Amino acid sequence: MVDLVYGRGITDIVREIPLYASIFKKFVGIKFFHTKPALYGSADIINVCNLHCSHCYWWLNRKDENQDLSVEDWRQTIRKTFKKQNLFVVTLVGGEPTMRPEIIEVFCQEMPRRVCVVTNGYFPLKRFEKLYFYWISLDGTEKAHNTIRGEGSYAKTKSNILEYIKGPPRNGKPAWKDIWITMTINTVNYSTALDLAEEWVGKVNKIGFQFHTPFMKGDPLWLEFGKLRNEMVDKLIDVRRKYPDFVINSEKQLSLMKRNWGGKGTTPIQCPSWAILSLDHMGRVKQPCCIGSADNKASKPICEDCGLGCYSVLVANGISGA
């Protein structure tokens, strides 16, 4: 199978022609009629995580709710939301989504090759036949990553990645193509971003960078706008030019990270938060975006300081406006 577009081969593209037609209609509506349809989805499939990372938004609003949706509950939710709205790709998050492999399997059954899993990679990576790919969170090189996620966590995740890519091809492609790395840049790890890219280029498929988004002013992890951040972005652009097939961010998207592109205060303005339908672990819609909460009284991300990759990529491609 030829790997044509972000891991999708000829067979995938032919099978998905009706879906592409639906997406095209959505883009026409957005551009010419100012409609606001959801394009992608995200789902917190579990309310538990094995780590307590210092920068993680999820713990801020987590409530001690032991109940999660069952397999069949999720199946019905998928059909009534993501599939009904013809969303192209759904990203599974948490908590730690790999702790509920049966739910990942349901998503893969319902939306084959259109499901990504964001994981800390602490547990062995299971091979799902119909998975799109894994996003593995690495917060810089080993020392910085361990500072954020706990001693020994980098070695554990690295070992699981390397073990996975030793495996046989999946869907006609080598296993390393299933692994994409995501790094959230903050004041602790920003100086290691380039080294992380150099460490993993040629070993995994892609790397994507985003910046820490604060929920409060004065957040010590937020790399504030200004000279240091601008220099960091310029270095990332250089890495993109050096490895255009490895760094997933475009130059335009990276350049957005030098300034406010999202909104005012906690209100989305330029950010197309409507473009991603985000559900929590009970299937409730999260507001104002994928790192928000279904609880209107919960803490909200500061849109004017946003560094999220999933929304900035849309703005960079001309989709904007709340």
Where are these regions (language model features)?
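Radical SAM enzyme [4Fe-4S]-AdoMet core and its adjacent flexible, acidic
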Residues: 1-4, 12, 64, 132-285, ...
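Short, charged low-complexity linear segments at domain edges
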Residues: 19-38, 271-291
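The −1 position to Zn-ligating cysteines in a subset of zinc-ribbon hairpins
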Residues: 48, 52, 270, 302-305
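Membrane-interface junctions of multi-pass transporters
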Residues: 280, 284-322
